[in-house]
Amino acid sequence: MTDRIVPATLVFREDGTVVSPLYGDIYHSAAGALAQADHVFIRGNGLPERWRHERAFTIIETGFGTGCNFLATWAAWRADPSHCERLHFVSVEKHPFAREDLRRAAAHIVAYTTITTITPIAPLVDELANAWPALTPGVHRLEFDDGRVTLTLVFGDALDVLPNLALRAHAFYLDGFAPSKNADLWSPAIFKSLAKLADERATFATYTSSGAVKRALDEAGFAYRKVDGFAGKRAMLVGEFAPRWRVRRHEPPRAFSTDRRDAIVIGAGLAGCAVVERLAARGWHVTLIERRERIASEASGNPAGVFHPMIARDDNLAARLSRAGFLHALHRWRALERAGHAFSRSTHGLVQLATSDDEFERMRESIDALGVPAELASALSRDDARALLRTDVAHGGWLFAQGGSISPAALAAAQCAAAGDRLSRIVGVEIARLERGGDGRWRALDASGATIAQASVVVVANAADAARIAGLRHAPTQRVRGQLTLLPPGSAPAVPLPVIGDGYVVPLANGVTLTGATYEPDDTDATPREAGHRENLERLERLLPAFSANALDAGALAGRVGFRCVASDRLPLVGELGDEAAAAREAAALTGARLRDVPRATGLYGAFGYGSRGLVWATLGAELIAAQIDGEPWPLERELAEAIDPARFLVRALRHGRVA
């Protein structure tokens, strides 16, 4: 089970410095946190000069603390007219502050700063605090300045989380409490993990100059030297990654190499439109190809869908992925709305009801055991659920305060609108196969062999057809029919917010109620059936006892059928596809392969198999693909990325000798 997050306690000393009662040490020098950040970390890493030579520049910090190093770096980036196009700041923190404590600490530090060489920082404090995520374990990606500055927070113990990151770092801010106060953060294991993430020209800087730290740096392949410390401190350490021997088996991720930043996305549902928006935001020109005459015509065309995280007592992979996807989606959706691309979604929460008293107790115990913050989920007794929903319920459940319902088609349209003139659409055309030419560019061909479009990169995001178009034999997915039912006004309890459990009920405009959905594997009938409506009515009756399934004529009801694409392990397929032909040629040498050993289909990516969780997973999946293409820090732990890697089935087949 993932360790729960224990927040930091905010304490000020008489001299105004912020101190940690847990570690018995200060967060910054009494001479000023921002001045310290500028002297030690920014100038110690040769910034801002060094980032001027990169399209994207990545910094890793080993302790976020009050956020002053990030704020000072962000301000320095803003003040530099020749700054890099995108700045990535990745910071690990075991004990993050709660939102308002962070705001108080950072605002206090900024108010007493004496630094004058960089742009004003006070306006940035509120931006950071307002975007501050729920204190849950894992990776949290925040974006500022229209996405040009990205803060990737990693909440957890550095010893555990650093080996699980996927990125290429240009600079390291080695910050944290003194080695004598927090020895684990300065242990050899930390520096070995950092060495696996270092660019060949990576630099580092740190306030400390202890002998133990110097030895650990040297053993990990970093060359160091002493320079004048901050505020009268005799020395601090700076240096660069300069290994004298091989210190890693795999190189950190690199950007996809191409002279033309153009891409094809096949499939204009939730998966594809999310990819379009994320690539266009990075300057890619995208051609979106959809076999229907308009976007979001398949399962994404449902009147509404629900979104919420999944909670499991053991915090398994699916639960962690859903939490990461849910929180990332909320962040991105708010950014779309702020940019003027509004879409229809409810904002009053969502209730998940238990199906038995025993299940309710397990649900309540899971929240307590995991330390789930109330802003994410809270237990709801039966009486409280009745009062909130204004109707009878059989059991209590969970309240997801930020969950709700959304129009998938409206979201897809907003994402395409955000792409602006970087998006070209081709509709009413079905792609039969893909072909990579001798020039390294991919061509999307129709059934006659005609080239519909060509580009450096292709993302297949067309659900159950994706594996066929990409020529994958080792990507087992299944089409699952789902029928939903629309109930006329006044025929169902008028719940004020979406309710899920054994099925779901969503209040729509004009008093209409949406309920569903059936789950019918390998059923290809696209016509709504009376039996499906009856099943949905019976499910609704179990969910809300005040409703009677027999009160309505199932044969007279309207509805819709969509088809989910579900992988055999119930997790999506997101990321760079494996090169199955190359793997077959090298099969004898790959029987013990890991995912990083498998040959890849250069420039070919997948985003499919989202099942019923497209709203939760599609935005995060799109960010992962865009990060992989552009060589940016991944927005989730490597362990989670590997759990949804499309090549995972190829690896399993290789291990069992089934690839030839």
Swiss-Prot record:
EC number from the UniProt entry: 2.1.1.61, 1.5.-.-
One of the GO biological process terms: methylation
Subcellular location field: Cytoplasm
Pfam families: DAO (PF01266), Methyltransf_30 (PF05430)
Catalytic function, reaction form: 5-aminomethyl-2-thiouridine(34) in tRNA + S-adenosyl-L-methionine = 5-methylaminomethyl-2-thiouridine(34) in tRNA + S-adenosyl-L-homocysteine + H(+)
Cofactor: FAD
Region named tRNA (mnm(5)s(2)U34)-methyltransferase: 1-242
UniProt xrefs under SUPFAM superfamilies: FAD-linked reductases, C-terminal domain (SSF54373), FAD/NAD(P)-binding domain (SSF51905)
Ranges for region FAD-dependent cmnm(5)s(2)U34 oxidoreductase: 266-660
Gene3D superfamilies from the UniProt entry: D-Amino Acid Oxidase, subunit A, domain 2, FAD/NAD(P)-binding domain, Vaccinia Virus protein VP39
Transmembrane segments: none
InterPro entries per the UniProt record, alphabetical: FAD-dep_OxRdtase, FAD/NAD-bd_sf, MnmC-like_methylTransf, SAM-dependent_MTases_sf, tRNA_MAMT_biosynth_bifunc_MnmC, tRNA_MNMC2, tRNA_S-uridine_synth_MnmC_C
Protein family membership: In the N-terminal section; belongs to the methyltransferase superfamily. tRNA (mnm(5)s(2)U34)-methyltransferase family. In the C-terminal section; belongs to the DAO family.
Function: Catalyzes the last two steps in the biosynthesis of 5-methylaminomethyl-2-thiouridine (mnm(5)s(2)U) at the wobble position (U34) in tRNA. Catalyzes the FAD-dependent demodification of cmnm(5)s(2)U34 to nm(5)s(2)U34, followed by the transfer of a methyl group from S-adenosyl-L-methionine to nm(5)s(2)U34, to form mnm(5)s(2)U34.
Protein name: tRNA 5-methylaminomethyl-2-thiouridine biosynthesis bifunctional protein MnmC
Species for this entry: Burkholderia pseudomallei (strain 1710b)
Encoding gene, per UniProt annotation: mnmC
